[in-house]
Amino acid sequence: MASKRALVILAKGAEEMETVIPTDVMRRAGIKVTVAGLTGKEPVQCSRDVLICPDASLEDARKEGPYDVIVLPGGNLGAQNLSESAAVKDILKDQESRKGLIAAICAGPTALLAHGIGFGSKVITHPLAKDKMMNGAHYCYSESRVEKDGNILTSRGPGTSFEFGLAIVEALMGKEVAEQVKAPLILKD
């Protein structure tokens, strides 16, 4: 079986933990993860001033698609940048048309709203993004820590980053693999 592939789209102002933790968890599961810089391959300044070096520019990473999952980290400015990007819209529309998994955390799901993705799905966001996400009644809101509805997987925020990453692993590779990845992480049940 060919290995699964993930594209994490990294925008200026992204939440560091929501980028790095799911990326790490997916890589531990053997998923080939590409962290793509929205505006290029240069280091990206995140919401808490941590710099993350992308593996590729989004432009180059798109040429290597399709991916099994597209991941959108949160962070208010990061989510705004994802929401304003025509390239992100095109990638998400293509992923949705192929019924591929789309995963977004914290404020990241607001990019789904901005680009008209997954309307009718049950979603979760950071509590501060709930009102924006529910504007227009395009989604059903969940109070879960992680919510998967069809091919849309969403989560609350930095504190749910491990659960979010493990949910992506489970969706792509099954519960057994997710449990194997989880065990050595010493997470609180």
UniProtKB/Swiss-Prot annotation:
One of its GO terms (biological process) is insulin secretion. GO terms for cellular component: cytoplasm; endoplasmic reticulum; membrane raft; mitochondrion; nucleus; plasma membrane; presynapse. Keywords: Acetylation, Autophagy, Cell membrane, Chaperone, Copper, Cytoplasm, Endoplasmic reticulum, Fertilization, Hydrolase, Inflammatory response, Isopeptide bond, Lipoprotein, Membrane, Mitochondrion, Nucleus, Oxidation, Palmitate, Phosphoprotein, Protease, RNA-binding, Stress response, Tumor suppressor, Ubl conjugation, Zymogen. A lipid is attached at residues 46, 53, 106 (S-palmitoyl cysteine). Its main location: membrane. SUPFAM superfamilies: Class I glutamine amidotransferase-like (SSF52317). Belongs to the peptidase C56 family. Protein and nucleotide deglycase that catalyzes the deglycation of the Maillard adducts formed between amino groups of proteins or nucleotides and reactive carbonyl groups of glyoxals. Thus, functions as a protein deglycase that repairs methylglyoxal- and glyoxal-glycated proteins, and releases repaired proteins and lactate or glycolate, respectively. Deglycates cysteine, arginine and lysine residues in proteins, and thus reactivates these proteins by reversing glycation by glyoxals. This is Protein/nucleic acid deglycase DJ-1. The lineage of its organism: Eukaryota, Metazoa, Chordata, Craniata, Vertebrata. The gene is PARK7.
